[in-house]
From Swiss-Prot:
Organism for this UniProt entry: Escherichia coli O6:H1 (strain CFT073 / ATCC 700928 / UPEC)
InterPro entries given in the database record: RsmH (IPR002903), SAM-dep_MeTrfase_MraW_recog (IPR023397), SAM-dependent_MTases_sf (IPR029063)
Keywords: Cytoplasm, Methyltransferase, rRNA processing, S-adenosyl-L-methionine, Transferase
EC numbers for this chain: 2.1.1.199
NCBIfam families: 16S rRNA (cytosine(1402)-N(4))-methyltransferase RsmH
Protein name, entry field: Ribosomal RNA small subunit methyltransferase H
One Gene Ontology term of the molecular function aspect: rRNA (cytosine-N4-)-methyltransferase activity
GO CC aspect terms: cytoplasm
Length: 313
């Protein structure tokens, strides 16, 4: 079924241009998806170039396996483990660029069977990799009311988190929730004030999805690993789709673009300062989609691309 879903790769040219591709370079596409970024990277690599792609979605892996190119390899797993994948291939400090396109993809949203969308009724799953971990339904059926409320507040910034959590728990006591339509209806009924521009279940679905897939922890671990695997001059090109993701990326790039923070007046020798090291990244700014791209693909509206370069420190 997956070939029936049209997929737009957001900020395609901009994200790949941000990598500053060298024909003989080694690159990582940490979120293969349907391969839009990977194919463009491959088109710019020479015979000696290499591209390592990663995805934890089995459907994405199936698409990746159709690419018959000796320069390309695919790994089925989370991008948070990119440090391990690189170490296994003896490529630590040799990666020339890492691209991450965060969040859920259009095919995942559009396929009702994946359970990501409140717009289509399907199994309440939401896992990026349906073969591993707890589904959204399983978690909601076993979680405490306070834990559900915390997730909705923390990852969905939902102001009615406590009311919605109570409604979910009460519904599950009477009849275990298994469908996306059920969750959407329970949330809508528990929301006292409706936003005319946004479905009342939007924040809840985002929060549960982020929790089920440990999305923010995945991002933080991948960013941390990037400092170890990138070569000097190597690039990070990262697309985020909501403020929680972008906040993590922005903070990481800002903190690592500074030198070591030493209290004013603290006596230190030149040798001691050298041991602290210099700044590890140089932030190269951010880009957002133009009006034409947003008109063609409304889901691109909230996307932000941030680019940084590894220093010699």
């Amino acid at each position: 079924m997956m070939e029936n879903y049209k997929h737009f790769t957001v900020l395609l040219d901009e994200a790949v241009n941000g990598l500053n591709i060298r024909p003989d370079g080694i690159y990582i596409d940490g979120t293969f998806g349907r391969g839009g970024h990977s194919r463009l990277i491959l088109s710019q690599l020479g015979e000696e170039g290499r591209l390592l792609a990663i995805d934890r979605d089995p459907q994405a892996i199936a698409v990746a396996k159709t690419i018959d190119d000796p320069r390309f390899s695919i790994i089925h797993g989370p991008f948070s483990a990119l440090g391990e994948y690189v170490a296994d291939r003896d490529l630590i400090g040799k990666i020339d660029g890492i691209l991450l396109d965060l969040g859920v993809s259009s095919p995942q949203l559009d396929d009702a069977e994946r359970g990501f969308s409140f717009m289509r009724d399907g199994p309440l799953d939401m896992r990026m990799d349906p073969t591993r971990g707890q589904s959204a339904a399983e978690w909601l059926q076993t979680a405490e009311e306070a834990d559900i409320a915390w997730v909705l507040k923390t990852y969905g910034e939902e102001r009615f988190a406590k009311r919605i959590a109570r409604a979910i728990v009460e519904h599950n006591r009477e009849q275990p929730m298994t469908r996306t339509k059920e969750l959407a209806e329970v949330v809508a009924a528990a929301t006292p004030v409706k936003d005319k521009f946004k479905h009342p279940a939007t924040r809840t679905f985002q929060a549960v999805r982020i929790w089920v897939n440990s999305e923010l922890e995945e991002i933080e671990q991948a960013l941390k690993s990037s400092l170890h695997v990138l070569a000097p001059g190597g690039r990070l090109s990262i697309i985020s789709f909501h403020s929680l993701e972008d906040r993590i990326v922005k903070r990481f790039m800002r903190e690592n673009s500074r030198g070591p923070q030493v209290p004013a007046g603290l006596p230190m020798t030149e040798e001691q300062l050298k041991k602290l090291g210099g700044r590890q990244l140089r932030a190269l700014g951010k880009l957002m989609p133009g009006e034409e791209e947003v008109a063609e693909n409304p889901r691109a509206r909230s996307s932000v691309l941030r680019i940084a370069e590894r220093t010699n420190a």
